[in-house]
Amino acid sequence: MKKFFTVFMLAFGALTMGNTALADAPKQGEQFDVVAQPISTENPAKIEVLEIFWYGCIHCYQMEAPLNAWVKKLPGDVYFKRMPGLPNPSWAPMAKAFYAMETLGVAEKLHTPLFEAVHKQKTLNPTDEKAAIDWVTKQSGLDKLKVEQAFKSFTINTSLNRAAITFRNSGATGVPSLVIDGKYITSSTMSGGNEQALKTADYIIDNVRKDKAAKK
């Protein structure tokens, strides 16, 4: 009888834990949602995580440390990329700065320092394009004319248009937001914090992976 009771309690405990885990799982319409319109990804064979951000956003700045640590641990079937949000023209200077730094090959070096210039040193106005050009020129050590040409290039204007369309299609209501596999979106606001948003992203990634495997 004692043995039966022990087995029963273990089974009951496992069932209870399973139900609790299920209850705690992120829910569509709460911690995440389906994007307004599916977004094309660069590599359909893998799972894409797209961060939508703005250098002028303090929450995006605060997201940097936990996000970077999380990205380093992503499995091989997941890749990460960034895209500046562009819901209105005032965000364009920082979006141009991001794409210009990519074009000039200094994005990896200057991404975090640009955040810090805006939020830590408070020496850069994120809505001032001329100030952004001056900052990138000084920090990169590149010729100013080359930086100006990058900011005003046709390629970057094309990237800005694409970013604006992607932002609209994602249904994002703010930043930082994470779009997983071009189909699902979560954010710190939806999930209740930066760490929670990353946990929600993990949950979505796991389910997308299972869905891809089932379709093979």
Pin down the residues of each PLM region.
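Structural alpha/beta surface segment adjacent to cysteine/selenocysteine redox centers
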Residues: 62-134, 203-211
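Solvent-exposed, acidic/flexible segments
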Residues: 46, 56-64, 87-94, 103-107, ...
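C-terminal cap of thioredoxin/glutaredoxin-like
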Residues: 4-5, 138-216
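Periplasmic c-type cytochrome electron-transfer domains
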Residues: 24-35, 127-130, 196, 200-201
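Short, contiguous strand/loop micro-motifs
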Residues: 54, 84-85, 120, 150-151, ...
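A short alpha-helix capping/helix-coil boundary motif
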Residues: 48, 75-78, 110-114, 141-144, ...
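A short structural micro-motif
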Residues: 14, 117-120, 153-157
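Extracytoplasmic thiol/disulfide redox context detector
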Residues: 2-89, 164, 168-169, 206-216
